[in-house]
Amino acid sequence: MESLISYFKDADEKTVIVFFGDHQPSDAVASTVLAKNGMSWNHLTEEQQKLRYQVPYVVWANYDIDEETGADTSANYLAAEVLERAGVPLDEYRSYLMHLKTEYPVISAVRTVKADGSEVRASDEKDEMDIYRKLQYYELFDHGTVN
């Protein structure tokens, strides 16, 4: 990381670098680590289970961008957030994501959080989540296809 940042620090071209790991180790690896610490899945609290799905990230730029520290977010928003902070115009899909983030700051396979901080089941937010899933599918697989 240090070498990469040092290289771009004085570059003339505006540069944004995102350091992000997409998940924690697999269950097989995590089970071994837990066992070596006298723990098992059966004895983890709900909060400890959730921590497995939290991954730190760092956004660095060689110019001033809007910064946010310690924000709870989810991977589906990260690209749109970085582009917005970098001053890059967002396409319609990423604009939609930034709007959705105001209502649901976290959407993941294991938890969905509303703007007020309350956790909800995605299945209980069916209408909004169905729209999101359809748009996400279109963006990933059908982009440019006329239906």
Go through each PLM region and give its residues.
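Solvent-exposed soluble domains appended to multi-pass membrane proteins
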Residues: 1-147
